[in-house]
A protein has these predicted regions:
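Transmembrane-helix signature of 12-pass secondary carriers
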Residues: 1-470
Length: 470
């Protein structure tokens, strides 16, 4: 890669404020993983208490996703007008309110509606927090800091599966307990500054942005050159017609390649089958003859593998590269689903084949969590130009959650109509399509500053080969 003039030197140290930003990002990711994952085990208790069938189960599971679509779209407007910092404070408050409202829901309908409120916070967090951290972080560790969010999703899922596997814990307690980390997130965010890039672009506050950079950069970091680069870009943005900024700016032809890549990755992270496994693994297994306790233990094991691969990805993504890592891992996920589906289609799904079925599930989680899942929020945080970043990340987040919503609302119905093996094969083919998309469209962004990525877009150089030459 050619170093652009005026780039800040690579400095890998973290100071207290940047570490706190990573912690807040991690808590928001933990809440996302926990609030979405807890429903997997809780549905078994909820269905017994409220006497509900598959349609209501799908509605309860999907409530958080509908709220996430609304939250991701709404929070883009809020973080552009009021700033990333204050928007995250609002999200923290909604996390608290949503968790407590779910815990006291009187019936299935009330629970589904409460999960819509909780989903607003989840969607808002996925749209705002990775972008906020990316705008605060130095480029040399930006990928790893943003992936703290993704890593914490894995932690949340593991905690949720462990809690869900303990039938001694009421589903009301397990869902309401999420209010505690949400309160910690609120207290942590109160200590953090606004994004320096937002301060310059929206407020013209160069001095304020300089103070923020002094707070979040380690000693010895060349703040002036980084500030000059941000300021120069912001001046060019401000000279741009307002019709080329925000939501209206998404119509520009030079922005479109970033939207295609970002939204395409968002769709395929969901179509890869990850949510099918997270939400419904216990239900699918018990419906096909697994003892309930064994199904819950498998769910915990899947969560642990997810977390381990998030940790591995956190440390290698800035070394191996986003594109290369994804291309290596996706074929393994596809093969796992093809083999898994084959067991069910050929009738080899009895107790004698339980170890092989579980091995396929774990292998899928290994390859999926260690590859494609890492890219969902990372690409959205770094791929879009500053003038449209909030709107574009909102579209990407809403695309992801809408795809997730569609899958969650239809999965159990699809399994009833076609069979579990056939559904596994459908998702295996989606993984094949994901690999082709990444190979064809996704450039290697590792080592490029946000401003350098934007220059490639403006120069119409956003194909994988364009970045390979730079």
């Amino acid at each position: 890669m050619t170093q652009a003039a005026g780039q800040a030197p690579r400095t890998n140290g973290l100071n207290g404020h940047m570490l706190m930003a990573a912690v807040v990002s991690a808590i928001s990711g933990l809440l996302y993983g926990y609030d979405t994952g807890i429903i997997s085990g809780a549905l078994l208790q909820i269905s017994e208490e409220f006497h509900i069938g598959n349609t209501i189960k799908e509605t309860i599971a999907a409530g958080i996703l509908l709220g996430a679509v609304i939250g991701s779209l709404s929070c883009s407007l809020l973080c552009e007008r009021f700033g990333r910092h204050r928007t995250i404070l609002l999200i923290c408050c909604v996390f608290i309110a949503g968790s407590l409202t779910c815990a006291v829901a009187p019936n299935a309908v009330g629970l589904a509606l409460a999960r819509v409120l909780l989903g607003f916070a989840v969607g808002g967090a996925t749209q705002t927090v990775p972008m906020y951290v990316a705008e605060l972080a130095p480029k040399s560790i930006r990928g790893r800091l943003v992936l703290c969010f993704q890593l914490a999703i894995g932690v949340g899922i593991v905690i949720a599966t462990i809690v869900g596997a303990s039938e001694a814990v009421s589903w009301r307690v397990s869902i309401g307990a999420a209010a505690a980390p949400a309160l910690l997130m609120l207290l942590g965010q109160l200590r953090l500054p606004e994004s320096p890039r937002w301060l310059i672009l929206r407020k013209g506050d160069v001095e304020g942005a300089e103070e923020v950079l002094k707070e979040v950069r380690p000693k010895g970091y060349d703040i002036r050159t980084e500030l000059d680069e941000i300021t120069a870009l912001a001046r060019r943005q401000q000279r741009t017609d307002r019709s080329h900024q925000g939501w209206r700016g998404l119509r520009q032809a030079w922005v479109r390649p970033a939207l295609v890549v970002g939204c395409g990755i968002a769709v395929f992270t969901q179509l890869s089958g990850i949510e099918m496994i997270i939400y419904y693994a216990p239900t699918i297994l018990t419906d096909n003859g697994f003892p309930r306790a064994d199904a819950l233990r498998v769910s915990v094991a899947l969560g642990v593998v997810y977390l381990v691969m998030m940790i591995v990805g956190l440390w290698i993504v800035d070394k191996v590269g986003r594109r290369r890592l994804t291309l290596v891992m996706v074929p393994g996920a596809a093969l796992s689903l093809f083999v898994l589906g084959g067991f069910y289609i050929t009738g080899h799904d009895g107790r004698a084949y339980v170890p092989a079925i579980v091995a396929c599930l774990l292998a899928f989680m290994f390859f999926n969590a260690g590859g494609l899942q890492l890219m969902g929020w990372l690409t959205g945080s770094e791929i879009y130009p500053l003038s449209v970043r909030a709107a574009a990340t909102s579209v990407q987040s809403a695309t992801l959650w809408s795809t997730n919503l569609l899958i969650t609302l239809t999965l159990l119905t699809m399994i009833s109509a076609f069979g579990v093996g056939q559904v596994f094969w459908i998702y295996a083919f989606f993984n094949v399509a994901a690999w082709l998309f990444v190979w064809w469209k996704m450039p290697e962004l590792t080592g490029h500053s946000l401003e350098d990525i934007e220059r490639h877009l403006k120069n119409h150089e956003f194909q994988p080969d364009d970045f390979a030459r730079s």
